């Protein structure tokens, strides 16, 4: 009786050890010859030894454990779950569908459209001087003498801004009759500049003459030259037109 009990216990131990040693079906996937791991039955891909995940058949890559997405073969990266796009290797940001530009890592913002570029006060005045030379009639070429700063230009959100500057008659070009020109004669121009998709300006200019000392010989000289002065005298004029604004290089 004791021997039969011992043999039954030994048989049970042998059966239990055989079940524990016998291997089941291996559901793990062995890597291929090139080191890549094919997807499992559910389409998921296990990460490699270095933690990287190979892209799928459509070229997309699943986010890593930290939520980051590696760029594709062309350097592009798919947007994240919140719609944002990570910065490229050079720090540039791809514009979104609505046209907005995200600042770069250094804080600067790339221009989206030319009419949204930052226009300085000097850029607007130089464009206004070019407009004057296009609109006025005569051989005289005006050039900028002084740009008078206007308060509220920097940081303002208004599209229409005030300008004030002085222009003078430049040297006479060779081969041109410039008898009606007075090199160095000043004119004071004021007006507004509209910063829009097509910038425009409304300017009013008037001659700026120095006030002479009222001595008797000055009065005689003015009387003798009165006719010549009246023939060459200029009247205030009004100019309105589109501006061709070009940004000046920043130092």
Curated annotation (Swiss-Prot):
Positions of transmembrane segments: none
Disulfide bonds: 172-181, 189-205
GO BP: antimicrobial humoral immune response mediated by antimicrobial peptide; defense response to Gram-negative bacterium; defense response to Gram-positive bacterium; innate immune response
Localization annotation: Secreted
Main location: secreted
Entry-linked InterPro entries: Cathelicidin-like, Cystatin_sf
GO MF entries: lipopolysaccharide binding
Keyword vocabulary terms for this entry: Antibiotic, Antimicrobial, Disulfide bond, Immunity, Innate immunity, Secreted, Signal
Tissue note: Detected in bursa of Fabricius, in filamentous structures surrounding the basal and lateral surfaces of bursal M cells (at protein level). Detected in bursa of Fabricius, in secretory enterocytes of the interfollicular bursal epithelium, but not in M cells.
GO (cellular component) term, any one: extracellular space
Signal peptide segment: 1-20
Region called Disordered, residue ranges: 29-109
Propeptide: 21-211
The keyword Disulfide bond appears for this protein: yes
Coiled coil: none
Family from the record: Belongs to the cathelicidin family.
Function, in words: Has potent antimicrobial activity against Gram-positive and Gram-negative bacteria (in vitro). May play a role in the innate immune response.
Classification via PANTHER family: CATHELICIDIN (PTHR10206), CATHELICIDIN B1-RELATED (PTHR10206:SF0)
Name used for this protein in its record: Cathelicidin-B1
Organism: Gallus gallus (Chicken)
